[in-house]
């Protein structure tokens, strides 16, 4: 079922890109959060329920959703499972055919993961984050003096920025 879902998502994204390109008369690049959302941004390191304080759920790549001490422990094997699942998804996307080109994207939340997948291109000698084609900053990760902005400034991938209602014009310009 998973392969069918991925194939369907790729076909929908490709169809939408074709419609948009035809209507606008310009090329359109289809980009999707195609390989899952395994990390969650959190404003607080912990959460409290009924007087019990535990680490926040940070996504399936980090810890479990169930509100128990065991589930909320960081588990490095989760990160490895996430990597394998994302790699399998990208293989399925590649197998859908060259005419259905969809690029993978995600928010660069887990900096250790992003750093581990950063490589220097042999020809250009420039670093690229190979965890996705397009990585982005979100509401909680786009602080100008933050580690996420510093990391994404250090790689040569195309980078997206999620700008919500709290963003100012000055912040947007500074991130450019």
Q: Residues of each region from the PLM?
A:
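Active-site-facing alpha/beta catalytic cores
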Residues: 2-176
